[in-house]
């Protein structure tokens, strides 16, 4: 197989770039001139007949044993129907639309398997079938994986990537991930070079980034790669280097980590080679914030805080402590009084003693305290502290004032005119806080649902366009368009198409992959800011026009539980629709995603029960848990914690003098039936939970395995 040394690599990539430009020109020319070598319908039909015939032969008991002879026969038959005899030497028949032939896919699956015993060389097969235009990204993915994981030949992987670039004009995240791993495994490397890797991956050409998230997934799923310490060290170095050069991008990557395990992987890799005395405090606090966002009960934010708190400069340490204040405000507690006590302990122990030190901005501390008191629900204490304890000089600070005004808008009944009067009295001018702009705009939408003038004036006065491609501002503008355009004669308004237009207007040169990612992020924020479930349902109904990604589907599903006018039964209908294909069978992709969808259902219903104390919903929760075996999903500790939390909240609410029958039956279900539903799930109950089940009246409470309280 051809091997490319690093000295020739850049030249090869330039050649690939030339081929890309050349193919673009050829496609333009061919749009007006019909090629003489187009495959005729008859020839295409014969190709599919061959595919069906040889797929059947390969499926026979002796098919894999005879794979070499089958392939040679298939190739001979291809030659018979090819157009090489037309005198156009070197021009292959255009089977480009047939790159997903099942026989070729299964052929590559077999010959790139670690247990393959045939003499067929995957590279030779790829070369031969490329002449017929029958090789696509899927086959390249299999062969790159083979040379990386089976053959441990990183230079060959890079050679194949260059060959792919010569043939195709679109990027492929999996191929880029395999190529990056191969680059990191090159034997003659000292330290990874970001610019060199970006040239190899052609990130500028494709308007993409190094696919770190995909690389992490590939490494974590392969034991050999996981145990490769040199690879781990080089990858950690590369990630740190790239994060330093592209901090905004890296923070966005943390924002789209939707599982605690993925975020933990990013943190472990980021911190592996990071000098703790030279860390980026914004990234560290972002890790804390995101861990808390994904799991409010997670102890990991405190672990991060304790790891860094004594090793930072005064200024950076102060920012870390501000992050702690935010985490504590969101951490679950039996009452808002206990949350208040925790917040004041952090304030008095960590933050107030820092005032007066060089580089310490007390206004940030007061703004953070206001935000934390608001988040924890202690609005009365917040107003008391604002009036009596915050010095006037800080009340006149725009950052502090906007934090206070945001809390007032979210926690009290205040009109838009009253809000505007407060803003006008300060003489600050344009708003700085995106969150405040969002809260005010939602107030405007609520008060002026039929006239866009007030919103348009507010938008212009504060120059919200100056925030550029800010996700929240674009989502806000989209929600405004939804509110006002759907109430006019514009019946063709499509939410996702509107967002796409906004993104492409701001970034006309953006790649398809990148604009789709931005559109999805804006739609996620659109779902978050929508105060009602109605626009979210409209977005779901329009999914046939714009394909919603899996994250959006989960968010739409969860909105039925989270929005005040959401409906549990409608959530169940959406769940059923997402899980079914046209023939009403669960598809393979949805089997892979079903744990996350099921987790969304469990989390959502638990939140509704905890919020409403509606014990009539417990049978529904039992039904969800009983569905797990049929979906091939296992119970998780995180789900169990959420379930137990709802039981505690209802039990301690004291809303009824007697224990509700539904609560008793559900408690018995958890103790008696859940172990049979998932025998592999072994949960250690806390002593106080066992005591709670006893007080509820669950007769089988003594069967529970306990751990410390």
Swiss-Prot record:
Lineage per the UniProt record: Eukaryota, Fungi, Dikarya, Ascomycota, Saccharomycotina
UniProt organism field: Candida glabrata (strain ATCC 2001 / BCRC 20586 / JCM 3761 / NBRC 0622 / NRRL Y-65 / CBS 138) (Yeast)
Segment annotated as transit peptide: 1-29
Described purpose of this protein according to its UniProt entry: May be involved in the control of meiotic sister-chromatid recombination.
Gene Ontology biological process: DNA recombination; meiotic cell cycle
The protein's name: Meiotic sister-chromatid recombination protein 6, mitochondrial
GO cellular component: mitochondrion
Record field: transmembrane: none
Superkingdom per UniProt: Eukaryota
Keyword Transit peptide (UniProt): yes
Chief location: mitochondrion
Keyword list, A-Z: DNA recombination, Meiosis, Mitochondrion, Transit peptide
Intracellular or extracellular location(s): Mitochondrion
């Amino acid at each position: 197989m051809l091997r490319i040394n690093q000295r020739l690599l850049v030249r090869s990539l330039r050649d690939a770039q030339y081929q890309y430009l050349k193919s673009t020109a050829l496609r333009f020319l061919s749009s007006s001139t019909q090629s003489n070598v187009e495959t005729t319908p008859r020839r295409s039909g014969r190709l599919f007949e061959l595919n069906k015939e040889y797929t059947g032969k390969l499926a026979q008991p002796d098919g894999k044993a005879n794979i070499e002879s089958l392939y040679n026969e298939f190739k001979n038959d291809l030659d018979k129907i090819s157009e090489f005899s037309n005198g156009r030497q070197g021009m292959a028949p255009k089977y480009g639309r047939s790159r997903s032939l099942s026989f070729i896919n299964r052929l590559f699956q077999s010959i790139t398997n670690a247990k393959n015993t045939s003499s067929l060389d995957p590279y030779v097969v790829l070369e031969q079938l490329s002449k017929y235009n029958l090789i696509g990204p899927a086959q390249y993915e299999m062969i790159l994986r083979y040379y990386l994981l089976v053959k441990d030949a990183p230079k060959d992987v890079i050679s194949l990537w260059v060959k792919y670039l010569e043939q195709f004009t679109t990027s492929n995240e999996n191929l880029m991930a395999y190529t990056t791993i191969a680059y990191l495994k090159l034997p003659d490397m000292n330290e990874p070079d970001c610019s060199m890797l970006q040239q190899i991956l052609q990130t500028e050409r494709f308007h993409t980034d190094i696919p770190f998230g995909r690389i992490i997934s590939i490494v974590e799923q392969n034991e050999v790669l996981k145990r490769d310490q040199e690879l781990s060290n080089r990858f950690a170095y590369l990630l740190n280097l790239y994060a330093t050069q592209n901090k905004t991008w890296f923070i966005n990557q943390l924002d789209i980590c939707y599982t605690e395990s993925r975020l933990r992987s990013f943190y472990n890799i980021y911190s592996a080679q990071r000098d703790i005395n030279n860390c980026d405090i914004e990234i560290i606090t972002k890790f804390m914030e995101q861990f808390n966002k994904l799991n409010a009960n997670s102890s990991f934010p405190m672990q991060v805080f304790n790891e860094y708190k004594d090793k930072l400069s005064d200024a950076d340490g102060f920012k870390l402590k501000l992050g702690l204040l935010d985490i504590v405000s969101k951490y679950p507690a039996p009452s808002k009084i206990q949350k208040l006590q925790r917040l004041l302990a952090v304030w008095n122990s960590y933050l107030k003693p820092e005032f007066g030190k060089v580089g310490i901005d007390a206004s940030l501390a007061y703004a953070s305290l206001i935000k934390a008191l608001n988040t924890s629900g202690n609005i009365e204490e917040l107003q008391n502290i604002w009036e009596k304890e915050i010095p006037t000089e800080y009340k006149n600070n725009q950052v502090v004032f906007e934090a206070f005004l945001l809390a007032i808008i979210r926690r009290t009944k205040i009109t838009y005119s009253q809000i505007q009067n407060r803003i006008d009295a300060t003489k600050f001018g344009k708003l700085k806080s995106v969150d405040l702009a969002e809260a005010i705009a939602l107030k405007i939408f609520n008060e002026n649902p039929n006239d866009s003038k007030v919103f348009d004036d507010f938008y212009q006065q504060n120059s919200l366009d100056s925030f550029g491609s800010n996700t929240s501002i674009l989502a806000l503008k989209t929600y405004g368009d939804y509110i006002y355009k759907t109430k006019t004669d514009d019946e063709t308004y499509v939410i996702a198409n509107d967002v796409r237009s906004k993104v492409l207007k701001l970034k006309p040169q953006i790649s398809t992959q990148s604009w789709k990612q931005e559109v999805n992020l804006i739609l996620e924020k659109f779902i978050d800011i929508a105060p009602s479930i109605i626009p979210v349902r409209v977005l779901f109904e329009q999914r046939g026009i714009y394909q919603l990604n899996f994250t959006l589907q989960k968010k739409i599903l969860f909105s039925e539980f989270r929005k005040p006018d959401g409906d549990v039964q409608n959530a169940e209908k959406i769940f059923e629709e997402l899980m079914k294909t046209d023939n009403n069978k669960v598809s393979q992709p949805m089997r892979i995603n079903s744990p996350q969808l099921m987790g969304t259902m469990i989390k959502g219903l638990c939140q509704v029960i905890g919020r409403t104390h509606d014990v009539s919903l417990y049978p529904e929760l039992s039904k969800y848990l009983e569905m797990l075996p049929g979906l091939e999903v296992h119970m998780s500790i995180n789900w169990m914690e959420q379930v137990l939390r709802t039981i505690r909240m209802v039990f301690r609410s004291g809303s009824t003098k007697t224990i509700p029958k539904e609560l008793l039956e559900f408690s018995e279900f958890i103790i008696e039936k859940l172990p049979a539903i998932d025998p592999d799930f072994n949960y250690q109950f806390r002593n106080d939970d066992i005591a709670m089940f006893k007080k509820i009246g669950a007769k089988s409470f003594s069967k529970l395995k306990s751990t410390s309280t």
